């Protein structure tokens, strides 16, 4: 489960219009979420709050064996008032990484221009002001650039400070500066504190993306790039200023059923003479491949009944294939991830080294459990439970429940009944050495809880239970168990 600060950072990326999927660093994110998830190793409690739309705090306390804690603060120039911050209202799927659906490449638009328009109720005036801002890029009243500041202080010695600075100087550019500093230990008090800075420059055009990075640790220079095959989204239209309006939606390649992306990365450190090189390919299905409704928004085809024809789905299940190669070390890795149903995802990975002939096989899955429909008459507008809410609505003390959409009036779902939401998820992964990880994440009242256990072969010095049932120096036992609790307001 993501930390609250990571959740807010993703909300910042979405609010600023940044596509985090169009990057080589996220090429294998789906397989990593299903196969490389971590389980809690002890008891940890997180208390978080989005006190204002632009300021968030988090306090963390860990116990069992070693007591530690941390304090985190975050500030964003973009108001995140539309981001659910209460743990009772946050969607569990937005906190638990799983199968990630990739969408067609899109041209990054300057969505931040709307931030300076305020919360005006006049939509026409807002669109006209937005259009004028596009026409005159030199206006002094242009928006503030999207910026995020985040700092975390780990309190127990050795004290560690981590900080992050994110800035969006343009719709296609993002700058990231990360700082890590650790206090010297008692043994080496005379030594200077350890610190390193990582600077990254991202550029995304929709068709391709590049990333330049520099780290003060060993003076490391790096480059990453990703290229999307197929139509160029920059040639599919863009902003329509002639009509006085600006398209708020991202322009994307129409009727794309699959996406093939290829990229690579290279690193070099002149200090330690270290060279790194890798390349990878990703093939994934797009929503148009299995959802016929996405085709209904495309221009009608000639020759059909009534002048239009909606094509049928091409594939039943969304899937993602990746292939990565590290030439210098001879490592080859392939992954296959499948979304068998809205509540079930499967993934597998096979790795092979051509130099040592070592191989790796990992399989994993995640299974979601949906919550039963609840009666909204017993809930206040803020989400709190109130058995007398229905009476207060009759007396006019609470606003009435919103009626259902006329377009969906044929549906059997009542407007007084909440839609089905995800309540919990179970993740399981196992490799060729029979190392198993089992993770349960769900909601208990207003708390978000993660509980996991890791099992595997134990070393000769670790007491365990042997296969015959007696005590033995070698066997199979748990290697980690823990619980993590998150509450946010």
Curated annotation (Swiss-Prot):
One Pfam family linked to the record: MDM10
The reply to whether Mitochondrion figures as a keyword in the UniProt entry is yes
Question: Might you report a single GO cellular component term?
Answer: ERMES complex
Q: What is the recorded membrane topology of this protein? A: Multi-pass membrane protein
Q: Which UniProt keywords apply?
A: Membrane, Mitochondrion, Mitochondrion outer membrane, Transmembrane, Transmembrane beta strand
Which subcellular locations apply to this protein? Answer: Mitochondrion outer membrane
The superkingdom of the source organism is Eukaryota
Annotated domain remarks: Lacks alpha-helical transmembrane segments, suggesting that it resides in the membrane via beta-sheet conformations similar to those predicted for other outer membrane proteins and porin.
What HAMAP family does the database record attribute to this sequence? Mdm10
Family membership noted in the UniProt record: Belongs to the MDM10 family.
**How is this protein named in the record?**
Mitochondrial distribution and morphology protein 10
